[in-house]
């Protein structure tokens, strides 16, 4: 269900000496600008393109055709979102920025370790390092695409090593049903085989920072009966 007009914000594009505006859901508009597959119909509060949204002054089909090469308001809206700016409130911008920072810090926590200890840095410590380094985060850019630049910026403050771990696991047959789907969420199964007793044996590659979480999940799923062996640590 589209956002109501009173909760929508304006997305604005100035081009060819003209201004074009649409009313959008700020969070879905952000997702769209990040490259996520969000139907334009769900983003728009109303299926119109305006010259001035506050006055309700709509753009004519002739104007849209002349400048955008189409009079379809949905196609024009996509162009406005891609090339224009979303007019967020200060609180919306602050919340989106905090959410994106924490997401980026969580990605780093999962994929990087402290080379001195082999363990991941806590998310809050990574966030503090980002603050100390004065890292710029773009709220309209995909979070994972910003991770490399963030790692580069905080490395002088926080030693980091990108790493994956390769682990051999054997799960008794009694627990395979409940463990199978959960285990696959952690990483990439490199190879697997089944024992005559129904046990599941596999080698999995996981992000370096989730090793302890992986072991804890295995123990919970198998009541401590899973057998594991760390085969390899691979730097990225």
Swiss-Prot record:
Q: Mind telling me which Gene3D superfamilies this protein's record contains?
A: 3.30.70.240, Ribosome maturation protein SBDS, N-terminal domain, SBDS protein C-terminal domain, subdomain 1
The record's Gene Ontology biological-process terms are: cytosolic ribosome assembly
Residues annotated as signal peptide: none
Q: Which PROSITE patterns match?
A: UPF0023 (PS01267)
Binding partners and assembly: Crystallized in association with 70S ribosomes.
**Pfam families in alphabetical order:** SBDS_C (PF20268), SBDS_domain_II (PF09377), SBDS_N (PF01172)
Protein name according to UniProt = Ribosome maturation protein SDO1 homolog
Family per similarity comment: Belongs to the SDO1/SBDS family.
């Amino acid at each position: 269900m589209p956002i109501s007009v009173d909760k929508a914000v304006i997305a604005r594009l100035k081009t060819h000496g003209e201004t074009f505006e649409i009313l959008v859901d700020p969070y879905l508009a952000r997702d769209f600008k990040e490259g996520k597959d969000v139907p334009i119909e769900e983003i728009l509060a109303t299926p119109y393109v305006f010259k001035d949204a506050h006055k309700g002054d709509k753009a004519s089909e002739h104007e849209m055709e002349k400048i955008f090469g189409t009079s379809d308001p949905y196609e024009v809206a996509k162009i406005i979102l891609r090339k224009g700016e979303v007019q967020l409130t200060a609180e919306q911008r602050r919340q989106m920025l905090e959410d994106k920072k924490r997401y980026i810090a969580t990605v780093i926590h999962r994929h990087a370790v402290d080379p001195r200890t082999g363990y991941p840095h806590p998310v809050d410590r990574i966030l503090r390092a980002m603050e100390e380094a004065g890292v710029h985060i773009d709220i309209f850019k995909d979070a994972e695409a910003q991770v490399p630049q963030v790692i580069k910026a905080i490395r002088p403050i926080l030693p980091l090593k990108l790493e994956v771990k390769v682990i051999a696991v054997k799960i008794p047959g009694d627990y395979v049903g409940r463990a199978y789907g959960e285990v696959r969420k952690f990483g990439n199964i490199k190879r697997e085989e089944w024992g005559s007793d129904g046990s599941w044996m596999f080698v999995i590659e996981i992000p370096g920072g989730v090793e302890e979480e992986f072991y804890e999940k295995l123990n919970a799923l198998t009541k401590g009966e899973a057998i594991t062996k760390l085969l390899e640590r691979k730097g990225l």
